[in-house]
Amino acid sequence: MKEVALGTVNNWCKGVIVWNLMLDNDRAPNREGGCQTCYGAVDISNSDYKTIIRNSHYYIIAHLSSVVKPGAVRIGASGYADSNIMYSAFENPDGTYAFVLMNNNEKTKKITLSDGKRHFAYDVPGKSVTSYRWAKSE
């Protein structure tokens, strides 16, 4: 999450590509001389082609796509000054806000999100990622 998603969009990237959606458990297919350490968002077992293993990129796609919609723009967010907390905020075309936060601390951290008119608090478990989406206050 840190390098692939939040780190890139926080540095003005307009999109994130997860190149390999599905590979087998030998990280194939691949080309000679190609990446030997790349993996798919999901791996499928080449013994039965039914068993699926969800890797970290699967969860990155799930978190972001659940709240950040096509055409969204990243907006400013400020607050938490903990080096083990990373987050990004977005405004979706339908006017909703999206917020994705990674807590890389061992312990739960209490956060408060505010859009300027209302706020809510949440306890973010240690070593977790949380995604939020809410309608703008009128």
Give residue ranges: language-model regions.
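Substrate-binding and catalytic surfaces of secreted/luminal carbohydrate-active proteins
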Residues: 1-138
